């Protein structure tokens, strides 16, 4: 029997504790879980991808079956095929997230019918945490320590120094 390989993608700009929770839970479902940092052309970048990757690798270092990869200008299904992933993992906070994700699921299935999407619901304590909300708090100098992993906080502090 072949290994179960999953792919969880996002812009992770920045990664939140909600992302971390979904990744930790998804890692228990697969032999190998890739976490793909994707550049979203519709979003203004806050942290450079290199900083995001470094922060994610530190935050996920305790998960032996998880590997962080970065991708520019590729479709998720193409990355999944390249990595041998047959499952896409998506986190859902609310009905709006499901509606948004369903359209991508449709196209992904059209492009590769052997790739399935698995949805994991956010835990109640993470329902209202979003990367855009964290960026907004940062814009106004607010403390975000309770919303992001320590390694991400370090990357943000280091980026602000430069």
Swiss-Prot record:
SUPFAM superfamilies: Nucleotidylyl transferase. InterPro entries: Cyt_trans-like, PPAT, Rossmann-like_a/b/a_fold. ATP binds at residues 11-12, 19, 91-93, 101, 126-132. Keywords: ATP-binding, Coenzyme A biosynthesis, Cytoplasm, Magnesium, Nucleotide-binding, Nucleotidyltransferase, Transferase. Its EC number is 2.7.7.3. One of its GO terms (cellular component) is cytoplasm. It is an enzyme of class 2 (transferase). One of its GO terms (biological process) is coenzyme A biosynthetic process. Coiled coil: none annotated. It catalyses: (R)-4'-phosphopantetheine + ATP + H(+) = 3'-dephospho-CoA + diphosphate. Disulfide bonds: none annotated. Pathway: Cofactor biosynthesis; coenzyme A biosynthesis; CoA from (R)-pantothenate: step 4/5. Substrate binds at residues 11, 43, 76, 90. GO terms for molecular function: ATP binding; pantetheine-phosphate adenylyltransferase activity. The keyword Nucleotide-binding applies. Its cofactor is Mg(2+). It is found in: Cytoplasm. It comes from the Bacteria. The keyword Nucleotide-binding applies. Belongs to the bacterial CoaD family. Reversibly transfers an adenylyl group from ATP to 4'-phosphopantetheine, yielding dephospho-CoA (dPCoA) and pyrophosphate. Homohexamer. NCBIfam families: coaD_prev_kdtB, cyt_tran_rel. This is Phosphopantetheine adenylyltransferase. It comes from Streptococcus pneumoniae (strain Taiwan19F-14).
